Each structure stands twice: as C-alpha cells, then as structure tokens.
Amino acid sequence: MQIEQLQINEIDNLHQVSSVEVGQHLYWQIGNFQVHAQVLITSWVVVAILVALPATTTGNLQSIPTGTQNFIEYVLEFIRDLTRTQMGEEGYRPWVPFIGTMFLFIFASNWSGALLPWRVIQLPHGELAAPTNDINTTVALALLTSVAYFYAGLYKRGFSYFGKYIQPTPILLPINILEDFTKPLSLSFRLFGNILADELVVAVLVSLVPLIVPVPMMLLGLFTSGIQALIFATLAAAYIGESMEGHH
C-alpha cells in the first residue's frame, strides 16, 4: 500500500509540474476552446492603429505628397523595394501586400510594447504586453510564412516543386523536409526571445532605478525591435523567393 501511495503521489507531483505556466494568462471560453485573450486584445489594438493611420491621413491625396502622405508613401516604397530585392523583378508584386503586412504588424507590435502603457490596464488575470511578446503570435507568423512558402513553390513550379527534396541526393530527403519547417520557426523563436528579453530588462531596470537609467535601454529596445521586424520580413521574402526559384 505504501508503494502504491508513493506512486500516486509521484504522479500527482508530475501532473502539477506539467500544469505550471510562465506568468498568468486571461482566457476566454468559446465553446469547448480557451482563447488567449491578452494576445487578441493587444493584436486588435495594433491592427486598429495600422488601419486607422492610413485611413485618416490619406483622405485627401495630393499629387505632390507632403507630411503624413509622404511618410506613408516612403514606407510603401521601402516594403516594395525590400520584396523586389529578395524575390527579383519577376513575380515579386503579388507578394508585396503579404510581406508588407508581416513587416508592419511585427514592427507596430514590437514598438507597442515600449510605447503603449499596457500594464496600466488591469485584468482579472495576467497583464497586457506586446503581441510578439507571446510565443503563440510568433509561431502563428511562422506558420503563415510556411504556408506562403509552400503555396509560392507549388503555384510557380507545380508538382515539380517536390523534386527539390531529393536534391542533390535522395539521402537528404528527411533533412530537406525538416529544413522547410525549421527556417520559419527559427524566425519565430528569435523574434519572441528578443522582444521578451527586451521587455524583461526594461521592467527590471525600471523597478530598480525608475528614472533616467532605463531610458537608454528603452531607446535600444526600439531600435532592436525595428531590426527584428526587418529581419523577419526580409527572410520571409527570401524564403518565398527561394521556393519559386527552386534552389537553396
């Protein structure tokens, strides 16, 4: 009996360990599913900002752009040039909206973690933070990149696209298959790790020295957040362009 009781206690302890979560989360119950409310709330705010900014500033377009219109056109040209550089002149145009959406959403999400006072809003459980501070968001972006990667290859090359998995030798088939999934996932973990680390460092410094010292770290965080958005969008465009060209 004592041995059985010890085994039951060990199983209970393992169950408690497996149910441990990092931080507290707010969930919405929709049918039989639990939805991560914090990520949805902050993501909706970021999307609303991205939609409202051009909608409110481009109502009266001018042939010679000035002010906000000039800035928005500059951003669009930057995204177009980025996509064209990674994919080439042929076939890059249909992918400009996808790469642009990726870049702008990640950029705005990263900056929202430093500029918006998320923690002022009180929740029953947990606290609000940048959408890219959550691994669910970055993995979802990686999965979208994977879907776009496969779609671009199949649309451009048909079923001959799968021939790349046995190049240069069929022995590399498992590695080539794994590579297609690890490339976008590595982007997601890099983005998640950088944004989470940045917010944790700033939070620790603010708690220790709440005045001048955290400011340089916040400025550095804004810079690295922009760089992370650029890296994700650039590599996503490069992977899609690679799938259409059919070489590694």
Curated annotation (Swiss-Prot):
CDD domains from the entry? ATP-synt_Fo_a_6 (cd00310)
Transmembrane segments in this chain: where? 96-116, 135-155, 200-220, 221-241
**What domain of life does the UniProt record list for this protein's source?**
Eukaryota
InterPro entries in alphabetical order: ATP_syn_F0_a_bact/chloroplast, ATP_synth_F0_asu, ATP_synth_F0_asu_AS, F0_ATP_A_sf
- GO molecular function term, any single one: proton-transporting ATP synthase activity, rotational mechanism
One Pfam family per UniProt: ATP-synt_A
Q: Which UniProt keywords apply?
A: ATP synthesis, CF(0), Chloroplast, Hydrogen ion transport, Ion transport, Membrane, Plastid, Thylakoid, Transmembrane, Transmembrane helix, Transport
Q: List the disulfide bonds.
A: none
The UniProt entry lists membrane topology as: Multi-pass membrane protein
Which cellular component appears as one GO term in the record? chloroplast thylakoid membrane
Claim: Transmembrane is one of the keywords in the record: yes
Main subcellular location of this protein, as a coarse class: plastid
In which compartments does the protein localize? Answer: Plastid, Chloroplast thylakoid membrane
Q: How does it assemble?
A: F-type ATPases have 2 components, CF(1) - the catalytic core - and CF(0) - the membrane proton channel. CF(1) has five subunits: alpha(3), beta(3), gamma(1), delta(1), epsilon(1). CF(0) has four main subunits: a, b, b' and c.
* Known role: Key component of the proton channel; it plays a direct role in the translocation of protons across the membrane.
Family designation: Belongs to the ATPase A chain family.
HAMAP family noted in UniProt: ATP_synth_a_bact
Q: What is this protein called?
A: ATP synthase subunit a, chloroplastic
Species of origin: Adiantum capillus-veneris
Whichever gene encodes this chain, its name is atpI
